[in-house]
Amino acid sequence: MAMRAKDALGRFGEEVASRHLAAGGAAILDRNWRCREGELDLVLRDGADLVFCEVKTRSGTRFGSAAEAVVGRKAARIRRLAARWLAEHPHAPSSVRFDVVLVSRPPVGPVRVEHLRGAF
């Protein structure tokens, strides 16, 4: 089955984000972790922090910025999923952080990556 363009763009963004975070010293613990309530894009360790990272990828501004997509219900859902992940992976981190990585892939020009630490 062919991958939909939206799914392919999302996978591209997650790969770019993973490489960006790893280059900054983070250790990727989980990618696309799923349970019946949903999916966490990335779970990583950044120093002493356990980080739950939502990746948003856009090819334009038609649907607003990627940062605007992670508010309210979406942020609350990610927090619930993080609690579920922690229940299944008792790491006892010293701190937990919620980040967003914004990947912009314009039709022309280079890919841009913006890492919002402690976004919500």
Swiss-Prot record:
InterPro entries: Restrct_endonuc-II-like, tRNA_endonuc-like_dom_sf, UPF0102_YraN-like
SUPFAM superfamilies: Restriction endonuclease-like
Molecular function terms, GO-annotated: nucleic acid binding
Database matches in Pfam families: UPF0102 (PF02021)
Protein origin, superkingdom: Bacteria
HAMAP family: UPF0102
Family: Belongs to the UPF0102 family.
Name of the featured protein: UPF0102 protein FRAAL5785
Lineage, opening ranks: Bacteria, Bacillati, Actinomycetota, Actinomycetes, Frankiales
